[in-house]
Amino acid sequence: MLNYIYNHSPIIFQNLMVSIKGKIFMKQRYTKHYYEEIKRLRECNDLFELQNQRFEEFYNYIKKNSEFYSEIIKKNNLSGKKITVANINQLPEITKDDIRKNVDKIITKKKNKLIKMGTGGSTGKSMVFYTNAYDMSRKIAYLDYFKEQHGVYKGMKRVSVGGRKIVPIKQKKKVFWRYNKPLNQLMISAYHADGENLKYYIKKLNKFQPETLDGYTTVIHRIARYILDNNIELSFTPIAIFPNAETLTDLMRDDIEKAFNCPVRNQYASSEGAPFITENKEGELEINVATGVFECKQIHGNIYELIVTGFYTTTTPLLRYKIGDSVELENELPVNYQQKDIKIKRIIGRNNDFLQSREKGIVTNVNLSTAIRFVENDVIESQFVQNDIDNIIVYLVISNDADKNNIIKKLKYELKFRFGTNTNFHFEFVNKIPSTPGGKKRFAINNIK
């Protein structure tokens, strides 16, 4: 009902609705826990000691309050064993499938006291998880602490680009943004940032004069390329730009820094609560041990798969979570490595396969995964295959009690935002998604020559 009212309201009223939602987010995120966390981070002199303390608190809490983890600990005869950061590998790893299938047993509080969240993930598997004001507040505190290291502070003029559908599909006006007044945040649409629309985005940026930008890497890069290709001079200079959700390449960084004349600072986390990897003032990537524990499983040479434990996930705990992302380290790790030995050279993430649209251009894994999010746990696995520009086959593995027609209806609606109205979608329900010879399952396959 609220979506219907929003979509049929004047833009000025939509701005008001966005600001009301922003006020609600502020109450959820800027609690006493936010201020306690950011104070502790600012004053901490030994982050590794803080990590040890936090792991002990986190482990004892979920052992007591999560039925799922309590059973795992007993099953592995670890009830009387003291588990620390140093011997965390005695615990079994968990996967996204484990969370998807057991979320009701994993959560540490009653559902009616939690906030329901979702992620499609760039593997194409949808997942529902839960959080609360305590976890959200501390996570936002860390993000703000990270930005403070680069001169950006809470309340500064900010432009954000993300997956929210802030522009109704039938809107004709070239107004691709909405203003969230409580957060002093201009939210710009990721779904319309292409072609000649980009000149309207840049005109608005010059008018708004943001002090910082954050959000989808590919969209920020697309705007930067338009600025460079058309020799546009901006009337503002941001303090720093913080791309997220997608892999940042060296070429993208160079283009963005040149277009906006400011530093780009990379970051890595996940919507479900993985600990942070962030870039310091010297341009080096650092694991942030105050936010969790990082384990690295060697794939080849200096390439390692990440296994993570997130301290900001007390509601849906992530303990030795196989997140499915990889990093390149500066050096190979010794067998009995410690947290301080992990020196990250590059965040690899997942393969950034992309699809194409005549109307929208490149559609990335992140764009597709946000569509899958809207069908929650009904979709177990998914895969998008494109053999020509106007047709996409969508393979879906669904739960036994899922409504196929409802899934198709929801996905068609979401995908129109990402591809436009001229792309045809062909849905096929299958028992499994085939693996590659290397054992991987690809989320997006582009066969266009």
Swiss-Prot record:
Q: Which organism is it from?
A: Staphylococcus aureus
Recorded protein name is Protein CapK
From the UniProt record, give one GO term of the biological process aspect: capsule polysaccharide biosynthetic process
Q: Which UniProt keywords apply?
A: Capsule biogenesis/degradation, Exopolysaccharide synthesis
Question: Which pathway does this chain act in?
Answer: Capsule biogenesis; capsule polysaccharide biosynthesis
PANTHER family per record: CAPSULAR POLYSACCHARIDE BIOSYNTHESIS PROTEIN
Entry's InterPro entries? Answer: ANL_N_sf, CapK_Type1_Caps_Biosynth
- Please describe what this protein does: Required for the biosynthesis of type 1 capsular polysaccharide.
User: Between which residues do disulfide bridges form?
Assistant: none
